[in-house]
C-alpha cells in the first residue's frame, strides 16, 4: 500500500498540480492586494469615496450585510479582469516564443528531401495496389 501511495504522490502530474496550487494561492494574494490596496482606493477617489461595505438592512438583532456582498462581487470582477489580462499577456508572450521556434526550423537537407520523395512514391504505390 505504501509503494502504491508513493507512486501516486510522486507522479509528475500530482507534483505539477501541487506546484500550481501553491503558485495560484500566492498569485491570488498578489491580485487581492492589487484590488484592495491600489484599484479600490483609486476607484473610490473617482467615484467620490463610495464604499459599499457599510450598507445593511437590520431586522432587530439580525443584519443583512448586502453591502459586503456587493463589494465582494465588485472585488471578484476586478480580480477576474486582472487575471484575464495576465493570462492574455502570458499567452501573447508564449505564442511569440512558439512563432520564433517555428521560424528557426532549418531547411531540410538534400537527404531529407530525397527521403520525403521516396516516402511519397511508396505511398502512391501502396494506394494503387489497394485499388487494384
UniProtKB/Swiss-Prot annotation:
Membrane topology: Multi-pass membrane protein
The organism's place on the tree of life at top rank: Bacteria
Protein location: Cell membrane
Residues annotated as transmembrane: 14-34, 38-58, 69-89
Signal peptide coordinates: none
Entry keyword set: Cell membrane, Ion channel, Ion transport, Membrane, Transmembrane, Transmembrane helix, Transport
Coiled coil (UniProt feature): none
Pfam hit, one: MscL
Annotated Gene Ontology cellular component terms: plasma membrane
Any one GO MF annotation of this record: mechanosensitive monoatomic ion channel activity
Main location as per UniProt: membrane
InterPro entries named among the record's database cross-references: Mechanosensitive_channel_CS, MS_channel, MSC/AndL, MscL_channel
PANTHER family assigned to the protein according to its UniProt record, in alphabetical order: LARGE-CONDUCTANCE MECHANOSENSITIVE CHANNEL, MECHANOSENSITIVE CHANNEL MSCL
Family stated for the protein in its record: Belongs to the MscL family.
Assembly information from the UniProt record: Homopentamer.
Role summary: Channel that opens in response to stretch forces in the membrane lipid bilayer. May participate in the regulation of osmotic pressure changes within the cell.
Protein name per the record: Large-conductance mechanosensitive channel
Gene giving rise to this polypeptide: mscL
Amino acid at each position: 500500500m505504501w509503494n502504491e501511495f508513493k507512486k501516486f504522490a510522486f507522479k509528475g502530474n500530482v507534483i505539477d498540480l501541487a506546484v500550481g496550487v501553491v503558485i495560484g494561492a500566492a498569485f491570488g494574494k498578489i491580485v487581492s492586494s492589487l484590488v484592495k490596496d491600489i484599484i479600490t482606493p483609486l476607484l473610490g477617489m473617482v467615484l467620490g469615496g463610495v464604499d459599499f461595505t457599510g450598507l445593511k438592512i437590520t431586522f432587530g438583532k439580525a443584519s443583512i450585510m448586502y453591502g459586503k456582498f456587493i463589494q465582494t462581487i465588485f472585488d471578484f470582477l476586478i480580480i477576474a479582469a486582472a487575471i484575464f489580462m495576465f493570462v492574455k499577456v502570458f499567452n501573447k508572450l508564449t505564442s511569440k516564443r512558439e512563432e520564433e521556434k517555428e521560424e528557426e526550423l532549418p531547411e531540410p537537407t538534400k537527404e531529407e528531401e530525397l527521403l520525403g520523395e521516396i516516402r511519397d512514391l511508396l505511398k502512391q504505390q501502396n494506394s494503387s495496389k489497394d485499388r487494384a
